[in-house]
Amino acid sequence: MIFNEEHKSQPITKLQVNDAFKKIRANKGSAGVDGITIETVSSNPRKYLYPLWNRMTSGSYFPKPVRQVLIPKGNGKMRPLGIPTVLDRVAQQVIATELENDVDKHFSPNSFGYRPNKSAHQAIEQCRINCMKSSWVIDLDIKGFFDNIDHELLLKSVAHYTQKKHILLYVKRWTEAAVELPDGTIKHPQGKGTPQGGVISPVLANIFMDIVFDKWISKRNPDNSFERYADDIIVHCKNIKEALRLLEAIKERFRTCKLELNREKTKIVYCRRNQKRQPPFKVRYQKFDFLGYTFKPRMEMKGGKMRMGFSPAISQKSVSRITVELFKMKVHRWVHFPLSKIAALLRLKIRGWLNYYGVFRKSEMRRLFKVLNQRLVKWVRNKYKRFKRKHWYYALKHLKGIAKSYPNMFEHWKYEGFRPC
């Protein structure tokens, strides 16, 4: 039977499905409950993508259960991660792309997460500027945001922006998709939570928060600037009274929308920018974390003089996370590789750290690269017998000599302050 796109009930083209698969293939990822991998689909796209397009255009597409795996968090706890099937990810990408094209132009300029031409660095820079203008910050932490978005309110939010029936149909089906737990049992959603691990979850979260928070605060408190990256939100206030009142209003707004703030992590912070000027009273918090950076009072060079500012730099939490990653890699045991090979293997990872955490106060990354250099010193001692029984200083001296002769070998060695010392 020959299918004609013009006669399909849902306006989805084969090109949309093919383009969506290209994006999914580029992002890689493992198989879902059906065991079908990206490589399997790539080897015979017509066998898999054509039936998917056929089902999506006829309205007969239903997602398979999402495979759940447990990922360790930095605090020792486990975080559930959902893995939809490859074909379900393709279907979600089709709708996510179309939905994003329709709604993104309506979003707040203060929303930075998972949007075209927006980035975390833009959010951090705007936050830095606003911290210089306003003395107080509300650091909001939503308890289990992605797991607690109410389905009814979410579907109403999507319907506010689009009346396309195929989008509303499939968003509803994805929210109702079952989850296969690690022990093999099937769990059905209880009317809340975005599609686990789904590529459509970010745009759905942005639609939901645009109505729940962005539009609400812009209308209610137009003078209070803010930055939002998905569920990470910073609100700026002129004084403590304004911050306290606004925080209570936000709590009530979230309660109305079936969200809850984390009491332990939500806090009001004083942005101290003057070394001589003390807070008007005893302040509990004078720093906060946002998108992997810590904002706090720091001495800065301004106009040829050292003055206090309130600026971002890589957070201790980020340093600790990367340090754990370095220890797990066991670089000091890679004695079967020459140092140049180790540098090549680590190049993209180190470059990624520098590109993200080195945008603001790059010098603060020194403590991170000190750990990496210590791993390399240990590698020298393990690699060469002549250093095993000697004091570690001699291995360090050897590594310093290599760094001096080949400063471009490791990405971080290109910066003098990050070399072995």
Regions found by a protein language model. Give the residues of each.
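Core structural elements
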Residues: 65-66, 175, 179-180, 337-355
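Short, solvent-exposed helix-loop connector elements
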Residues: 190-194, 309-311, 328-342, 352-365
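Extended C-terminal regions of large enzymes
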Residues: 372-375, 380, 384-421
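Non-catalytic, peripheral interaction segments enriched in hydrophobic/basic residues
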Residues: 342-387
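A conserved non-catalytic segment of reverse transcriptases
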Residues: 173-176, 258-335, 351
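Non-catalytic, polymerase-adjacent accessory regions of viral genome-replication enzymes
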Residues: 1-47
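Amphipathic alpha-helical blocks
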Residues: 30, 40-65
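Conserved polymerase palm-domain catalytic core
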Residues: 55-70, 74, 109-111, 115-118, ...
